[in-house]
Amino acid sequence: MSILKKSIIASAALALPLAVSANSKLEKMMKDPSQWVQQSGDYAGHRYSTLDQINKSNVSSLKVAWSFSTGVLRGHEGSPLVIGDTMYVHTAIPNIVYALDLNDNQRIIWKYNPVKGGKYPGGETMDRVISVMCCDNVNRGVNYHPNGTIVLHAADTSVIALDAKTGKEKWVTTNLHAGTGKYGVSASTGSGQPFIIKDTVGVGCSGAEFGVRCNWTSYNIKNGKRLWRAYSMGPDKDMLVDPNKTTSMLKPIGKDSS
């Protein structure tokens, strides 16, 4: 891992406790073991549940209670969310989202597919996006905001806010219009989960292997308006860092360090 990446991760870790206290409703939901409201369970990424119905004395006797096929035969990463009595399941490309009723034999309440007319919201075809995706065509999951929104970060980098009850689009924005990378190809893609902080949703991007200048971008959860964007490499004004207060290896990184 590069020093830059270590610095970004350390900065994010320090900021998270403030974000948690600022979104008390989401924090309260995270503490409810009957729900799974964020990828990895909480901001700390513990991936731990306090539910004790399954334990070391009965785990060897587990049997399949039910199963659900998404119909997408690609790699799968990320976890389903459980909000109340509804489970939200996502897929790899084309990034379909399902809402299942856990009280009614996993009935499909709604299904959302961001690919319409063969294209993603940003105008890219599915085949075009697949051609520049690294390491399989996976998606690392949707996330939830307590205002009743499921957020999807699609493979073409679109950020899509869905009504948790109906699956209808609240807003859609294309994070990066696939950009032109070092080798003259549209190379920006999205596979990471959206991250809910206060009343914002943040997303990163992929494509550095094609020369894409990646970044972290924050959007207003209510309307999808872009709030700010910080790049992973300089100059400092584009990284949105204070070179004297941002540290690496316990020392200030200094002006234009990248």
Regions found by a protein language model. Name each.
Residues 13-14:
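Short, linear, compositionally biased motifs with a strong N-terminal bias
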Residues 101-105, 164-166, 221-223:
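Short loop/turn segments that connect beta-strands within beta-propeller blades
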Residues 1-9:
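Bacterial N-terminal signal peptides that target proteins for export
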Residues 17-19:
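N-terminal signal peptide c-region/cleavage motif recognized by signal peptidases
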Residues 54-57, 100, 162, 219:
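Hydrophobic/aromatic beta-strand positions that recur at structurally equivalent sites within the blades
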Residues 23-70, 107-131, 168-177, 225-234, ...:
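Aromatic (tryptophan-biased) beta-strands that constitute blades/sheets of beta-rich domains
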Residues 162, 214-225:
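Beta-propeller blade signature
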Residues 33-40, 75-96, 127-159, 185-213, ...:
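Repeat-blade elements of multi-bladed beta-propeller folds
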